[in-house]
Amino acid sequence: KAIELKPDYAEAHNNLAFTLNRLDRLDEAEEGYKKAIKFKPDFAVAYYNLGVVQDKLLRFDEAKKNYKKALKFKPDYFEAEYNLNIILRQDELLLKIEQSKIHEKKKNIIKISSSTRLTSNPFLTNRVVEKELLTSLYKINSKELNREANKGSLRYGNGRCSDYQLFEDESSIIKNTSEDLINIMKQAVQSDIYVIESFFNIFRKRSGITIHNHMVSFDKAYELSNQKYSLTYYISVGDQNCREPGILKLYDPEEEILPSNGSIIIFPATRNHSAVYDGKTDRIMIGVNFYSLI
């Protein structure tokens, strides 16, 4: 109705396109965002939303351009910066996979079969947590979680989370931790690896993360689902003497793991998982999403 009354109403075109996107009517949503931009050329949110749709349509180069335009008009646009960074890292990943294939051919090494890879059973190990690591995470920039579940974010409740570039932090303790975890990841998947995301969560009373996995359209487009994995490293499990002690719940098949301080769990990124926490003290974990290169 708003568009009928005012055809050049950019915000209305953006809002309608957002609804079409949620209904998975992606081509129509794309046209709607383009109309919004036509009537408001500096509309950062519309550029970002257009990039999201093009990402879903597997047109990553176009998405990249629109994330950059969103940042041009809104330099502090966190979501646009994150999505752009992911696409740039995906470009780097594809290059590394190709280089790895060439290297393996030169060495005449037979590719590891899927039967020898980490599959449905999680890989479990442990790493001693340094006190310095625990204290350093509180000093790194983080943001509050959404208070309610299903409000646009997987994580919810009382707590905080970092951005997705934790391993790029310059502190010696983070560098040492990332090196150790990368070696563990290589051991788990029997391959060199590429980290696409690294972050930390601090969960407090009445918090958690909804059922989800870590597959994205890029993985489907490049047939990388069987090469993507997720790691959780428990820095502090918090208060487990409560109704919801932070059990890691894995699905298909269902499995429950109650971690301890220092626990490391690695599983395929295709696998759905969730956790709920209601303890009195902070529950802190580092998360990593990564790919095997062969």
Please provide the spans of the model-predicted regions.
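Conserved alpha-helical positions within TPR/SEL1-like repeat arrays
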Residues: 11-22, 45-55, 79-86
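Catalytic core of non-heme Fe(II) oxygenases with the double-stranded beta-helix
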Residues: 190-277, 282-285, 289-293
